[in-house]
Amino acid sequence: MRPRIGKLVFIGLIASLLTSAICIGANESHAFSPRAVRLQVATTPKPAKPRKPLPAPARWRPLIGEYVGDSETLIILETDGRLCALFKRTELAPLKQLTADTFEFDSSTTRKGERVVFSRNRGKVTQLTIGTLTYKRKPLGPEEGANQLKIQPLRPVPILIKEALSAQPPNETGDFLPTDLVELRKLDPTIKLEIRYATTNNLFSTVFYSQARAFLQRPAAEALVRVNRKLKAAGYGVLVHDGYRPWYVTKVFWDATPDDKKLFVADPAKGSRHNRGCAVDLTLYDLKTGKAVEMVSTYDETTDRAYPNYPGGTSLQRWHRDLLRSAMEAEGFTVYEAEWWHFDYKDWQKYRIGNVQFEQIGR
């Protein structure tokens, strides 16, 4: 939803993980960079594993996450049925469970025999220790109630909407393709919608769209229909959170956001990719249950976990993420560098910034 990469500078090289026959599947992509220090390049991922991984054991789920030490952040993740520790973004070390909260490093690592002990407070994991080193758990997910960006609008949103509807998008010159926005559900009713900006479940906790509908430029919409049909063979469909976004909504986002958080929203003076009708935010849903699958991060999350190549989480979460990305890229979409859920269709720059409201499309 937000162009945070465009406001920052790429620093350093992309770290890549060393592989382990025990811990890493041959087809997983793990290159990434920490959000606070450097930003990752969205390289083409290796194909998702043909065999769907099993869910991680429930007893490990509370342990998975990031832990901050004096000089590094340690990631505890599950891969191929093993719990592992990732050091310095390069060294992946498998763990062997001894008790509920005590592990030791596997014999395949240079840390063989060292103990890893997790500590809890009222049932919640708060830290881990390795010898004399202590790593404090870093709150990441919404289940921990931290680091989920929420923006308190500077002014009442209804007033901002009224003002934005009276404003004009930036004037653009050049040759553009004709706008041909089509409604996704009219092309394929099996595409599910959960339009967050038609609800209060979003960054601003405010409703922006008067209708829960999703539109894309026709070539992008038809490509997404092909993605949805191909995914059915694997037992999945696409669930769309956002598509075409009228320019006036982008202006409201900007006007509602404090200066120190404006890097998370698009500048209306330039417009956003969503304004051009070729950007889509989406995830997968399970055809059997009808429910959205679990990914490494939540939608619109602003932590490192949102990166398309973030190595943490579980094998199944990463497999879902890579399955979506592979399917989208096969039909001409490109993933956004900092958000696994945001994809841009090829030639998106060739469309004008749009400002037509949902109610007026197709009239």
Predicted regions and their residues:
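Extracytoplasmic cell-surface/polysaccharide-interacting catalytic and binding patches
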Residues: G145-H241, A256-A338, D347-R363
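Bacterial N-terminal signal peptides
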Residues: V9-A21
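Low-complexity, intrinsically disordered Gly/Pro/Thr-rich segments
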Residues: G113-K124, E329, Y336, W340-Y345
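K/E-rich alpha-helical interaction surfaces of small helical-bundle regulatory domains
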Residues: R61-T73, M328-G332, E339, D344
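N-terminal secretory signal peptides that target proteins for export/translocation
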Residues: M1-G6
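Beta-rich nucleic-acid/ligand-interaction surfaces
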Residues: W247-F253, F343-K350
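Peripheral terminal and inter-domain segments
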Residues: N27-R155
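A mature extracytoplasmic/lumenal domain signature
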Residues: D80, R89, T99, T109, ...
